[in-house]
Amino acid sequence: MNSPLIIIRGAPGAGKSSLGRNLKKKFPSAALLELDNFRGMMNVDWTDEQQHRIALKAAALAAKTFCEQGITPVIVVDMFLPEQLNYFLAEAGEINYRIISLLADETTFEKRLAERKEGFIDLEKTIEINEQLRKNPAAHETIIDTSGKTKQEISGMISAK
């Protein structure tokens, strides 16, 4: 994994945050940026697309700064629907990146969302997001089906690629 920027995208419950945390542990100078944390810095309205764009821009600038200072890889976690991904990459500038897209089946999402104590738990919207990502792959992305997989299995799958 030689890219200074690793983008992990997927629907809620796909395993993005867990993979991001596990990957960060594997690199001595990595940084982990979760868009939910950037959004949470505001009086967040989770349905407000303008707030999401502000958070995307802030995260892109943070990622760019970390990379410029040699803090790599920078692992960025969000849903990253196509328009959001394009906006983030434009704001981040000319940084080599790798995209990892996590997809899963409905049964897996149902189980994972039911286990959540907080956060996004709308199964119907989650499945819709998952299908958008499945139907609109990013160029040169690595797609991982996390259906029925544990956090450790998902981390092992990406380490092997």
What function would you assign to each model-found segment?
Residues 13:
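Walker A (P-loop) phosphate-binding loop of P-loop NTPases
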Residues 93-113:
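Conserved phosphate-donor/acceptor-positioning beta-strand/loop module used by diverse small-molecule
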Residues 2-5, 71:
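Pre-Walker A (Motif I) flank of P-loop NTPase domains
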Residues 20-64:
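Conserved substrate/cofactor phosphate-moiety recognition/catalytic segment
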Residues 54-94:
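Glycine-rich phosphate-binding loop used to anchor ATP phosphates in small-molecule kinases
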Residues 118-157:
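Small-molecule kinase domains that catalyze NTP-dependent phosphoryl transfer to phosphate-bearing small molecules
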Residues 8:
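Hydrophobic anchor at the beta1->P-loop junction of P-loop NTPases
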Residues 16:
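Conserved lysine of the Walker
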